[in-house]
């Protein structure tokens, strides 16, 4: 789903047929692409399934989904936090992971977030400004925001959503695709590790809060012309694939999520989607039947503002930036020069020893990737002629100039042909200047769910 200008004729909605990607096709789609994923444990599973699918056509195991903060997962590397720091369930928990393929043509990085906007997010944006520019950013933060930051959490969430979209609009280059994942539906009983025992009474209203938070985040993302993938809609009937904790999902759900995400990305980049002759998937077929019955009872997309009695968004003014008590030093120069176009991410230098500290001088944009999978990708489509923005890597995309294939969802708005955002180029990106006192290791406690 995307938001764009008014008075644009809607494209024909496709049926609920699902596109399935093989590993070789994912390798081609993300060839020479830098993918950044930010969010909670759900987004960590999104990262893990994408890393796995970049290497082989298998599903995650239950133990891989359950593991958190491990030193290595499927040839990736834990860069910071997790087992390198202290395992706890506090809002200062950090975990940074990175996967670089053996060929050096795929780079995927994950940052664990406990709040959609914070000083830590500004640190992340500053780190990204020193390395290659991301080609794809996938982000969500909702459950922690609505359950761990006081009684006015929804108001704070809205303010922080506006902050993060403004900053992403300023920092990311024009060529970067940002996809905001809406939070997935919760179960009636929520026992995820992010919800402390003393906060269990909040679980009663958290399901409704997530729907309301999704409404605000989709609206604000649309205001900034960012793409939105409505996972709440797509997984509303997948109850049996949700874990007993009411929050997390099994490996089949996450592979389905990966296919939805990759289809959205391929369509946004104008890539011809693969066509496979395959037997129907009973799991997907069950969803299709429920989707049709849902659509039959709503000739038009439902008005969720009326159903949820949500107020219209008033004119919103960005709160003043956070202030800090001492003067700031100028930002240090990057440790590595920008990558030339079509250069693999792997440069052969060893990964520097990394102690988990907030230090702008420490950069892990281009680590040695270690042993990788020596797979041979399929034939690549011809590269596309035209300018490539600074720091970007030309991949094997096929621009067809065809209408977007948008799946049915309550927020459908068609995408116009050209870009609707006008952001600063990579070389002119704004770097956050106010800094908070750098913390060392995160506080001790229990492991997050």
From Swiss-Prot:
Coiled-coil region: none
Source taxon at top rank: Eukaryota
Family: Belongs to the PC-esterase family.
Record protein name field: PC-esterase domain-containing protein 1A
Species of origin: Mus musculus (Mouse)
Source species taxonomy: Eukaryota, Metazoa, Chordata, Craniata, Vertebrata
